[in-house]
Amino acid sequence: MKIVFMGTPDFAVPSFRKLIEEHEVKAVLTQPDKPKGRGKKLAYSPVKEEALKYDIPVYQPTKLKDDKEIIEKLKEINPDFIIVVAFGQILTKEVLDIPKYGCINLHASLLPMYRGAAPLNWVIIKGEKKSGNTTMLMDVGLDTGDMLLKEEVEIHEDMTTGELHDILMISGGELLLKTIEGLCSGSIKPVKQEGETFYAKMLDKELAHINWTEDAYDIHNLVRGLNPWPIAYTEYKGERMKLYKTKVLYKEVSNKPGTIIEVNKEGVKVACGKNVLIIEKVQFPNGKPLTIEQYINGHSIEKDIILGE
């Protein structure tokens, strides 16, 4: 099958490789090169780097909907499918109508739940027990197209967004291959998205600031959901303290929320609006992430200090 692939970050690369192995990828569309690092040198997207290894033509529209030259090129290619994995741009009807079998999107949630830009984060922040990938036939809406195939994964109580990302990143490629095969054979029938939904909006930095009046369970989910980025944080004696790993102690205490009630090598116990949060791994300014056992070897964390003040 002739395929045009549209994708940008690491998440899209394994799917791209699978398509190269099984089909004829005629072109790649990815986001423009962006300044990176202290030197602000232009850096290629992970998908562009991969495409160049295979000498596949790469196009980088700032806004595809306004780029008539690239749209005409897509029409010349006349692909059977356009496959989209975390491309980062909305496709117009003109582009959606180009491929013979349609545009397929791999979305990292069990649609219709968690449409939007940050499904991996929000599914964990909300404390869900399962997630997965969904393939869908794209329409002009945002993640609203007819569903094709789904694949579920369990979310264990300590799983981070980074860990879920890596699982779904690898499994997504196989799901795309099955979807292409099923559409070509007629064995897959598109299903309308109906029922409850939740929009997984882009993350903002304010979300990362911990509110200790909340239940420790919800704070734990926030910590997991914001790891590896942007990382949930609080303040200890005026210094920013980032939380990388926590667990919940289901125990009622009378201390003011945010109060450190115990410190040992297993962790820092903090009173919350409900239950107790045990902080197991932290990072302070100019330091690297350390377990509490590592950190208290050379530094002190004092009992009775109130975090966030």
Swiss-Prot record:
Binding-site residues, (6S)-5,6,7,8-tetrahydrofolate: S109, L110, L111, P112
InterPro entries: Fmt, Formyl_trans_C, Formyl_trans_C_sf, Formyl_transf_N, Formyl_transf_N_sf, Formyl_transferase-like_C_sf, GART_AS, Met-tRNA-FMT_C
Signal peptide: none
Swiss-Prot/TrEMBL keywords: Protein biosynthesis, Transferase
MF annotations from Gene Ontology: methionyl-tRNA formyltransferase activity
GO (cellular component) term, any one: cytosol
Catalytic activity: L-methionyl-tRNA(fMet) + (6R)-10-formyltetrahydrofolate = N-formyl-L-methionyl-tRNA(fMet) + (6S)-5,6,7,8-tetrahydrofolate + H(+)
E.C. number(s) listed in UniProt: 2.1.2.9
CDD domains in alphabetical order: FMT_core_Met-tRNA-FMT_N, Met_tRNA_FMT_C
Domain of life: Bacteria
Protein biosynthesis in keyword set: yes
Function according to Swiss-Prot or TrEMBL: Attaches a formyl group to the free amino group of methionyl-tRNA(fMet). The formyl group appears to play a dual role in the initiator identity of N-formylmethionyl-tRNA by promoting its recognition by IF2 and preventing the misappropriation of this tRNA by the elongation apparatus.
HAMAP family noted in UniProt: Formyl_trans (MF_00182)
Family membership: Belongs to the Fmt family.
Protein name according to UniProt: Methionyl-tRNA formyltransferase
Taxonomic classification: Bacteria, Bacillati, Bacillota, Clostridia, Eubacteriales
Gene: fmt
